[in-house]
């Protein structure tokens, strides 16, 4: 396959930003495929796209999503939970926001402070 054909195939691959509600949180993730599901009342999201850098800095939100959806080949989201689907030119940051405040939720592995005996 010629380099120009390969570049065209990459350009033809669509990218979607999908925003949906999950457990009282607003999830924003990226996917290569969004269609009406064969299950009535659901939207089918597949080809989830996550950051693939091998660097030392890891986005904890993206890592949480990757682990949460690692065994899912297709997400069937209830249509009433889908807030928005956008076709985008490039991938952005995956986010989890609090539904009420809209603030970004960052899952940090925090251990409780140790108790010292007095």
Where are these regions (language model features)?
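Eukaryotic intrinsically disordered, low-complexity regulatory linkers and tails enriched in Ser/Thr/Pro
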Residues: 1-118
């Amino acid at each position: 396959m010629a380099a120009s054909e390969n570049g065209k195939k990459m350009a033809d691959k669509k990218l979607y930003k999908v925003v949906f509600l999950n457990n009282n949180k607003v999830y924003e993730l990226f996917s290569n495929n969004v269609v009406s599901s064969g299950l009535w009342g659901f939207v089918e999201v597949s080809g989830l796209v996550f950051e693939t850098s091998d660097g030392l800095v890891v986005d904890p939100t993206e890592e949480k999503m990757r682990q949460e959806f690692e065994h899912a080949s297709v997400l069937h989201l209830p249509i009433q939970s889908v807030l928005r689907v956008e076709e985008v030119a490039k991938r952005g940051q995956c986010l989890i926001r609090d539904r009420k405040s809209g603030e970004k939720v960052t899952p940090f592995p925090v251990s409780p402070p140790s108790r010292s005996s007095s």
